[in-house]
Amino acid sequence: MADKPLTADQAEELHKYVIDGARAFVAIAAFAHVLAYSLTPWLH
């Protein structure tokens, strides 16, 4: 465990990376779902 809590600046930087990662994950997942829907006949 960390001995000291994050500063506000450190927390904001970490939050930015977490949100950017979540956005990238959602974008890739949405793209994969569109591909799966368009390329697989059993989903239509």
Curated annotation (Swiss-Prot):
Topological domains, Cytoplasmic: 2-16
Keyword Glycoprotein: no
Sequence ranges on the Periplasmic membrane side: 40-44
GO terms, molecular function: bacteriochlorophyll binding; electron transporter, transferring electrons within the cyclic electron transport pathway of photosynthesis activity; metal ion binding
GO biological process: photosynthesis, light reaction
Top-rank taxon: Bacteria
Membrane topology: Single-pass type II membrane protein
Record's keyword annotation contains Magnesium: yes
Sequence positions that bind a bacteriochlorophyll: H15, H33
PROSITE patterns listed in its UniProt record: ANTENNA_COMP_BETA (PS00969)
Subcellular location: Cell inner membrane
Transmembrane feature ranges: 17-39
InterPro entries per record: Antenna_a/b, Antenna_beta_CS, Antenna_beta_dom_sf, LHB-1/5, Light-harvesting_complex
GO cellular component: plasma membrane; plasma membrane light-harvesting complex
Keywords on record: Antenna complex, Bacteriochlorophyll, Cell inner membrane, Cell membrane, Chlorophyll, Chromophore, Light-harvesting polypeptide, Magnesium, Membrane, Metal-binding, Transmembrane, Transmembrane helix
Main function: Antenna complexes are light-harvesting systems, which transfer the excitation energy to the reaction centers.
Record note on quaternary structure: The core complex is formed by different alpha and beta chains, binding bacteriochlorophyll molecules, and arranged most probably in tetrameric structures disposed around the reaction center. The non-pigmented gamma chains may constitute additional components.
Family named by the database record: Belongs to the antenna complex beta subunit family.
The protein's name: Light-harvesting protein B-800/820 beta-1 chain
